């Protein structure tokens, strides 16, 4: 069974983030995430959301370890008093050579020092396999429902073959509602296709960015757009293209959980 989760960007004002976090938890979402650009403090923003909630799982999507190494991640978790028992620590390779080796070393380092769930952000099959055989979870992104389902099947099969517990499988899905947000989605697509890793991902999979997101003219279209995501992965993480205005973001929180 697939559950819904929600993600906010670090650009979301703290007051809005706290309000939305409380609403996400009360509405029954399975987890709450924050992105973590290399030069921003995603963990600090997540701490704001943690303070506004009591039980929901908290995730990072994802901390780039080339910019924020594992020891710095752990220091920031301590500084912000993030509860490790609620933390789903998503990490990504970032930039540089030997990303698989860097991630494998980071998983070992973090697992020895924190009880948090260690989640690997993965675009390609080799990073997914690393997550399947070494991590507690795998976070997919920029995939269609069909690709997400196939990747989840592969991850579970690889974990079973390795004789280890099956990791959680999660997927980020960008969402926009209304003309203004649909325009922002187009801008996000243009940005992603300029990033080498994402450009390679789209070439490899043969999909376009617009095939991987939820683009709704209005909230009434959400049920039909969410339907293909049922029974794909463990959690579909909705990522509003913009949550700066509290009203539309609250409406999305309410409408999506009601539709799923």
Regions found by a protein language model. Name each.
Residues 1-260:
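Active-site-adjacent structural elements that line small-molecule/cofactor binding pockets in enzymes
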